[in-house]
Amino acid sequence: MNPNCARCGKIVYPTEKVNCLDKFWHKACF
């Protein structure tokens, strides 16, 4: 199960995942 982006709310896939502050982000959203 993939997490949702903390900014846009869409699914974050492992290839574009940024983990910060215990949340997941897309590289573009971070």
UniProtKB/Swiss-Prot annotation:
Post-translational modification as stated in the protein's UniProt record: Phosphorylated.
Taxonomic superkingdom: Eukaryota
UniProt GO molecular function: actin binding; metal ion binding; monoatomic ion transmembrane transporter activity
Modification N-acetylmethionine occurs at: M1
Function, as annotated: Plays an important role in the regulation of dynamic actin-based, cytoskeletal activities. Agonist-dependent changes in LASP1 phosphorylation may also serve to regulate actin-associated ion transport activities, not only in the parietal cell but also in certain other F-actin-rich secretory epithelial cell types.
Self-association and partners: Interacts with F-actin. Interacts with ANKRD54. Interacts with KBTBD10.
The protein, known as: LIM and SH3 domain protein 1
Organism from which the protein derives: Sus scrofa
Gene: LASP1
